[in-house]
């Protein structure tokens, strides 16, 4: 049996896609030089689904994640988030859609150093137009759920690496997004702490039915997600469990 199959990468029938990419292409240009990253990628992520994206360094995994999140513009093709075609939106509209429908967790936490853990997690709620009381309530609930209820008044410099990343996870989930995009979210942590943060993300995925799309080099973590997709030579292919 062929362990690797070229991915049209469809979701289960009748599932609602929180993110969909159609014929996605990205080429970088510098002067007369053209460097194609990938061409004609199709991807659909269902509500509550967890997807790992693996591949060699430089394969374009982070580029793909940025395109899915509307942080970069594809050379060709379309990305749909919560049913909205990203290319049809203005910069302001894309920003609003990202804040409402997507969460982001990176290898480095990107917490604002001058703000406390509570204030950092409140930020996306405030940006969505809700008042301070609502933002504080939602942020406190998430910080409690990630085990940081006793650290809400601490700034990032006063938190451990694992605590900072848990705070970043809380920030990503505070608006109850349809999908969280993670770029090596545990890559900067020791194995034990990485496992704790990963378990936390899976627990919140189950509790909130938030989809996860995680770029990772850790095949062990990848195997625990619903699907594993490998980006190889500009193509996405789905790996059978025994091939991961």
From Swiss-Prot:
Start and end residues of each ABC transporter domain: 19-244
GO biological process: lipoprotein localization to outer membrane; protein localization to outer membrane
Subcellular localization: Cell inner membrane
Gene3D superfamilies: P-loop containing nucleotide triphosphate hydrolases
Keyword Hydrolase: no
A Gene Ontology term for the protein's cellular component: plasma membrane
Pfam families assigned to the protein according to its UniProt record, in alphabetical order: ABC_tran (PF00005)
Keywords: ATP-binding, Cell inner membrane, Cell membrane, Membrane, Nucleotide-binding, Translocase, Transport
Recorded topology in the membrane: Peripheral membrane protein
Main location, first listed in the record: membrane
EC numbers, comma separated: 7.6.2.-
Binding site for ATP: 55-62
InterPro entries (alphabetical): AAA+_ATPase (IPR003593), ABC_transporter-like_ATP-bd (IPR003439), ABC_transpr_LolD-like (IPR015854), LolD_lipo_ATP-bd (IPR011924), MacB-like_ATP-bd (IPR017911), P-loop_NTPase (IPR027417)
An example molecular function term from Gene Ontology annotations: transmembrane transporter activity
Complex formation: The complex is composed of two ATP-binding proteins (LolD) and two transmembrane proteins (LolC and LolE).
Family assignment from sequence similarity: Belongs to the ABC transporter superfamily. Lipoprotein translocase (TC 3.A.1.125) family.
Role noted for this protein: Part of the ABC transporter complex LolCDE involved in the translocation of mature outer membrane-directed lipoproteins, from the inner membrane to the periplasmic chaperone, LolA. Responsible for the formation of the LolA-lipoprotein complex in an ATP-dependent manner.
UniProt-recorded name of the protein: Lipoprotein-releasing system ATP-binding protein LolD
Gene encoding the protein: lolD
């Amino acid at each position: 049996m062929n362990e690797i199959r070229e991915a049209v990468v469809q979701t289960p029938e009748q599932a609602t896609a929180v993110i969909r990419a159609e014929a996605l292409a990205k080429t970088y240009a510098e002067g007369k030089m053209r460097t194609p990253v990938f061409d004609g990628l199709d991807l659909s992520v269902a509500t509550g689904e967890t997807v790992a994206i693996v591949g060699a360094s430089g394969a374009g995994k982070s580029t793909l994640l940025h395109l899915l999140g509307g942080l970069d513009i594809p050379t060709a093709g379309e990305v749909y988030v919560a049913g909205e075609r990203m290319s049809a939106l203005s910069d302001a509209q894309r920003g609003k859609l990202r804040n409402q429908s997507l969460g982001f967790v990176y290898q480095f936490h990107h917490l604002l150093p001058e703000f406390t853990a509570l204030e950092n997690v409140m930020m996306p709620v405030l940006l969505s137009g809700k008042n301070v009381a609502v933002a504080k309530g939602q942020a406190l609930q998430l910080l409690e759920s990630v085990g940081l209820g006793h650290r809400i008044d601490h700034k990032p410099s006063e938190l451990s690496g694992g605590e900072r990343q848990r705070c970043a996870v809380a920030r990503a989930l505070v608006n109850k997004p349809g999908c969280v995009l993670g770029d090596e979210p545990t890559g900067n942590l020791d194995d034990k702490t990485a496992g704790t943060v990963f378990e936390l993300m899976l627990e919140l995925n189950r509790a909130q039915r938030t989809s996860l799309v995680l770029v990772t080099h850790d095949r062990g973590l990848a195997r625990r997600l619903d699907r594993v997709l490998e980006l190889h030579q500009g193509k996405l292919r789905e790996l059978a469990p025994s091939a991961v």
